């Protein structure tokens, strides 16, 4: 909701009851994952405050339990640590922090690029490169060369997208809507989630399967849905920071089409519902085949989409009057 004086406006939200109704499957390893994440943050102190650690560990452990509910306990922890690392890096070095000191973000990005290129172990005094080095070594041991390289490439894309986002976050009106729609799947981490899911769930598409139009269309629909849902859920929190409007779908739709914020939310919500219908159709089509890597991929994408729908109800994404942590991804 938004406030104008004493008036309260409820912003319209998309309805997913026909496409991704809850309750969603949940891993039995959520509590163990939460404990492991807290211990991992002791080894790699990525966040400065106990509150920030608590909020991020909570949403990450509960979120991954819905993202990959069939993963085994150790693989779920590995996936959770990767997602926590990405989110913590964005919270600490991306978005508004980066807009104030873009040079520092570029320097941090250079450090991570060296790690992704297979450089020497970074010192533990620099927790983000050190933690990334640890994660990459464990993923490399877990999978084959092709899957590992896809994961590393997706991480590079995500990190570079965060630099792009930081460059534009203070003046979102300068960003073309089409460019934003192409970049958003990278800044919301969903392409990295796709790559990690194949490793964690122990399946791998062939190049021919990956090139199939139904697979590409389904991946695009889920990737779009993830970013757009997140934009609607986090808009109020980001707008409360001011003075610029958030670099997000409602802002750019309003710039393109005019009208009120409520109209922009309604338009974005319609886009979400349409993309959810495309995703559901693709999942139903692929998952109905005999068990194979394609059916495993369809089920994985279904759970990933469900997890983004679930995330919107977490305190991290609630408005400022409801006590959310000052983060937005």
Curated annotation (Swiss-Prot):
Organism in which the protein naturally occurs: Streptomyces cyslabdanicus
Binding, Mg(2+) 2: 95
Residues given in the record as substrate binding sites: 184, 237, 316-317
Any one GO molecular function term: metal ion binding
Family, per entry: Belongs to the terpene synthase family.
Catalytic activity, as annotated: (+)-copalyl diphosphate = (12E)-labda-8(17),12,14-triene + diphosphate
Enzyme kind, highest EC tier: lyase
Motif NXXXSXXXE motif: where in chain: 230-238
Gene3D superfamilies hit by this protein: Farnesyl Diphosphate Synthase (1.10.600.10)
Ranges that cross the membrane: none
Free-text function comment from the UniProt entry: Involved in the biosynthesis of the mercapturic acid derivative diterpene cyslabdan A, a potentiator of the beta-lactam antibiotic imipenem. Catalyzes the conversion of (+)-copalyl diphosphate to yield labda-8(17),12(E),14-triene (biformene).
Cofactor annotation: Mg(2+)
Record keywords: Lyase, Magnesium, Metal-binding
Co-factor binding comment: Binds 3 Mg(2+) ions per subunit.
Residues reported in the UniProt entry to bind Mg(2+) 1: 90, 95
The keyword Metal-binding is assigned to this record: yes
Lineage: Bacteria, Bacillati, Actinomycetota, Actinomycetes, Kitasatosporales
Motif (DDXXXE motif): 90-95
Keyword Magnesium recorded: yes
Domain topic, free-text comment: The Asp-Asp-Xaa-Xaa-Xaa-Glu (DDXXXE) and Asn-Xaa-Xaa-Xaa-Ser-Xaa-Xaa-Xaa-Glu (NSE) motifs are important for the catalytic activity, presumably through binding to Mg(2+).
Protein name according to UniProt: (12E)-labda-8(17),12,14-triene synthase
Enzyme Commission (EC) number: 4.2.3.193
Cystine crosslinks: none
């Amino acid at each position: 909701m938004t406030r104008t004086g004493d008036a309260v406006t409820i912003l319209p939200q998309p309805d997913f009851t026909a496409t991704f109704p809850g309750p969603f499957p949940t891993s039995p390893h959520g509590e163990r994952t939460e404990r492991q994440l807290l211990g991992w943050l002791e080894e790699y102190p990525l966040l400065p405050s106990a509150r920030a650690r608590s909020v991020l560990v909570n949403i990450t452990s509960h979120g991954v339990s819905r993202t990959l509910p069939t993963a085994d306990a150790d693989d779920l922890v590995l996936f959770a640590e990767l997602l926590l690392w990405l989110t913590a890096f964005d919270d600490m070095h991306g978005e508004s922090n980066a807009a104030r000191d873009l040079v520092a973000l570029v320097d941090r990005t250079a450090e991570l690029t060296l790690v992704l290129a297979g450089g020497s172990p970074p010192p533990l005094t620099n927790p983000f490169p050190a933690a990334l080095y640890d994660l990459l070594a464990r993923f490399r041991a877990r999978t084959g060369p092709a899957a590992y390289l896809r994961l590393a490439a997706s991480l590079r894309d995500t990190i570079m997208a965060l630099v792009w986002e930081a460059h534009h976050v203070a003046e979102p009106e300068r960003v073309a809507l089409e460019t934003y729609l192409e970049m958003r799947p990278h800044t919301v981490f969903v392409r990295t989630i796709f790559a990690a899911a194949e490793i964690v769930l122990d399946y791998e598409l062939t190049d021919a399967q990956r090139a199939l139009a139904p697979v590409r269309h389904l991946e695009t629909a889920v990737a779009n849905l993830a970013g757009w849902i997140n934009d609607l859920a986090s808009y109020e929190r980001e707008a409360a920071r001011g003075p610029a409007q958030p670099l997000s779908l409602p802002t750019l739709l309003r710039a393109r089409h005019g009208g009120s914020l409520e109209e922009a939310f309604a338009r974005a919500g319609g886009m979400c519902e349409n993309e959810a219908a495309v995703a559901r159709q693709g999942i139903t089509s692929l998952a109905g085949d005999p068990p194979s890597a394609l059916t495993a991929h369809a089920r994985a994408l279904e759970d990933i989409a469900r997890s983004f729908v679930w995330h919107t109800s977490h305190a991290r994404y609630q408005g400022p009057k409801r006590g959310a942590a000052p983060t937005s991804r």
